[in-house]
C-alpha cells in the first residue's frame, strides 16, 4: 500500500521515492510489526485474562509447568495481526507471492484457532480431532501446491536445490506438489511441537526468518543467484519484506512470551508460523535449508516419532518425556537453560545453513 502511494505521489514529492526501496521497506516492516505487537500485546493479554482463555497444563508434565496453568494463550493472534498488517502496509501487493504467503499463514492460523478455541473456550480436552486437523492442513497445503505448480512461469520455480552441489538442480515436475505438501505440513507441525516452553519456538522462528530474508534477497537478484548457483526468482524480492514482518512480530511477541511468560501463542500461532516458514522455503526453493536451519524443529519432531514408535513396538520409552525439551526438564535442567541452549543451537544451525550457499 505504501509503495503504491509513494509511486503515485513521487512526481510531486520526490523524497517519497525512498519508501519504494526494498531495504527501507524491510526495516519499516520490522519496526511496524514490532510496534504493533508492543502496542496491542497488553490489550490482548487483558482480554484473554478477562475471558479466562488460559493454558491447560498436562498433569503428567514437569512439575515446574503447573504454575503455568491459566496463563493467557492464543497469543498467536497478536503475531498474525502484526504480520498481516505490516505486510499489507509495506509489501508490493501486485506480487503474487505476498498473497500466497498470507493465504497460507491465515489458513493454518484458522486451523490452530479452532483447535485452541475448542480446547480452551469449549473445554474439549483434545481440541480439534487430530484427523480433522490433518485433513484441513492437507487440503490447504495441496491447494497451495497446485496453485504454485500451475502459476509457475519459469523452470527455476519448480527445481530442487541440493546444498553443496553447483549444477544439481533437477526439474521436479509433478513431484513438486508432494514436496510442497510435506514441507508446509511438516514445518507447521514441527513448530507446533516445539512450542512447549517460554520463548522456545518464537526465537528460532525469528532467526530462521531473518536468514530467509537474506536468501530471498539473493534469490531475487540475477547476479547473486548465478554467482551462488541458486535459482533466480525475481518475485522472491517481496519475501524479504514478509520475513521482516516475522522478525518484528516475533520479537514483539517475545517481549511478553519470555520466561516467565505472560502469554502463550497457542496453536493459532505455532501452526501458522510453521506453515509460513515452510511456504517461504518452498518459494525460494530451499527446502533442505529449512531442515538445516530449523534443525531444532526437526529434532523435536523426531523425538516424538521415536518415543511413540518405541513405546508401541517395545513398550519402552526412549526419552523421559517427549518432545525432547521436556526430557531435559525431567532431567532437572531449569527451563531458561533449555530455552537458551536451544537458541544457541539454532544460531549455529542458521550459520551453517547460510554457509552452504557458498560452499558448493
UniProtKB/Swiss-Prot annotation:
Superkingdom per UniProt: Bacteria
Involved pathway(s): Cell wall biogenesis; peptidoglycan biosynthesis
PANTHER family listed in its UniProt record: PHOSPHO-N-ACETYLMURAMOYL-PENTAPEPTIDE-TRANSFERASE (PTHR22926), PHOSPHO-N-ACETYLMURAMOYL-PENTAPEPTIDE-TRANSFERASE HOMOLOG (PTHR22926:SF5)
Catalytic activity, reaction form: UDP-N-acetyl-alpha-D-muramoyl-L-alanyl-gamma-D-glutamyl-meso-2,6-diaminopimeloyl-D-alanyl-D-alanine + di-trans,octa-cis-undecaprenyl phosphate = di-trans,octa-cis-undecaprenyl diphospho-N-acetyl-alpha-D-muramoyl-L-alanyl-D-glutamyl-meso-2,6-diaminopimeloyl-D-alanyl-D-alanine + UMP
Cellular component, GO annotation: plasma membrane
Xref: Pfam families: Glycos_transf_4, MraY_sig1
Co-factor(s): Mg(2+)
Annotated EC: 2.7.8.13
Keywords carried by this UniProt record: Cell cycle, Cell division, Cell inner membrane, Cell membrane, Cell shape, Cell wall biogenesis/degradation, Magnesium, Membrane, Metal-binding, Peptidoglycan synthesis, Transferase, Transmembrane, Transmembrane helix
Protein name: Phospho-N-acetylmuramoyl-pentapeptide-transferase
Family: Belongs to the glycosyltransferase 4 family. MraY subfamily.
Positions of transmembrane segments: 27-47, 71-91, 98-118, 142-162, 168-188, 199-219, 236-256, 263-283, 288-308, 338-358
KW Cell membrane (keyword) present: yes
Disulfide bridge map: none
A GO MF label: UDP-N-acetylmuramoyl-L-alanyl-D-glutamyl-meso-2,6-diaminopimelyl-D-alanyl-D-alanine:undecaprenyl-phosphate transferase activity
The organism of origin for this protein: Psychromonas ingrahamii (strain DSM 17664 / CCUG 51855 / 37)
InterPro entries for the chain: Glycosyl_transferase_4, PNAcMuramoyl-5peptid_Trfase, PNAcMuramoyl-5peptid_Trfase_CS
Stated role: Catalyzes the initial step of the lipid cycle reactions in the biosynthesis of the cell wall peptidoglycan: transfers peptidoglycan precursor phospho-MurNAc-pentapeptide from UDP-MurNAc-pentapeptide onto the lipid carrier undecaprenyl phosphate, yielding undecaprenyl-pyrophosphoryl-MurNAc-pentapeptide, known as lipid I.
BP term (GO), one: cell wall organization
Places the protein is found: Cell inner membrane
Topology of this chain in the membrane: Multi-pass membrane protein
Amino acid at each position: 500500500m505504501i509503495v503504491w502511494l509513494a509511486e503515485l505521489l513521487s512526481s510531486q514529492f520526490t523524497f517519497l521515492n525512498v519508501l519504494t526501496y526494498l531495504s527501507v521497506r524491510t526495516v519499516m516492516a520490522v519496526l511496524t510489526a514490532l510496534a504493533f505487537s508492543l502496542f496491542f500485546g497488553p490489550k490482548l493479554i487483558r482480554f484473554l485474562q478477562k475471558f479466562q482463555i488460559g493454558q491447560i497444563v498436562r498433569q503428567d508434565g514437569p512439575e515446574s509447568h503447573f504454575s503455568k496453568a491459566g496463563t493467557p494463550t492464543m497469543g498467536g493472534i497478536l503475531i498474525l495481526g502484526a504480520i498481516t498488517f505490516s505486510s499489507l502496509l509495506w509489501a508490493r501487493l501486485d506480487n503474487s507471492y505476498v498473497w500466497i504467503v498470507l493465504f497460507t499463514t491465515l489458513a493454518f492460523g484458522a486451523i490452530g484457532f479452532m483447535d485452541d478455541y475448542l480446547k480452551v473456550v469449549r473445554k474439549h480436552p483434545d481440541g480439534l480431532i487430530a484427523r480433522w486437523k490433518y485433513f484441513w492442513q492437507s487440503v490447504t497445503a495441496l491447494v497451495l501446491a497446485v496453485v504454485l505448480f500451475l502459476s509457475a512461469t519459469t523452470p527455476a520455480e519448480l527445481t530442487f536445490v541440493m546444498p553443496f552441489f553447483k549444477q544439481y538442480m533437477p526439474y521436479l515436475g509433478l513431484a513438486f506438489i508432494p514436496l510442497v505438501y510435506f514441507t508446509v505440513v511438516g514445518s507447521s507441525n514441527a513448530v507446533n511441537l516445539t512450542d512447549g516452553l517460554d520463548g522456545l519456538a518464537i526465537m528460532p522462528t525469528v532467526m530462521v526468518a531473518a536468514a530467509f530474508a537474506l536468501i530471498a534477497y539473493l534469490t531475487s537478484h540475477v547476479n547473486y543467484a548465478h554467482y551462488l548457483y541458486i535459482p533466480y526468482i525475481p518475485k522472491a524480492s517481496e519475501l524479504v519484506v514478509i520475513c521482516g514482518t516475522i522478525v518484528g512480530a516475533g520479537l514483539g511477541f517475545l517481549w511478553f512470551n519470555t520466561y516467565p511468560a505472560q502469554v502463550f501463542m497457542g496453536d493459532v500461532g505455532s501452526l501458522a508460523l510453521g506453515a509460513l516458514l515452510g511456504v517461504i522455503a518452498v518459494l525460494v526453493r530451499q527446502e533442505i535449508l529449512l531442515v538445516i536451519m530449523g534443525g531444532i524443529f526437526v529434532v523435536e519432531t523426531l523425538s516424538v516419532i521415536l518415543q511413540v514408535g518405541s513405546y508401541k513396538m517395545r513398550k519402552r520409552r526412549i526419552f523421559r518425556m517427549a518432545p525432547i525439551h521436556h526430557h531435559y526438564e525431567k532431567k532437572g535442567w531449569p527451563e531458561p537453560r533449555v530455552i537458551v541452549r536451544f537458541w544457541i543451537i539454532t544460531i549455529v544451525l542458521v550459520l551453517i545453513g547460510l554457509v552452504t550457499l557458498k560452499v558448493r
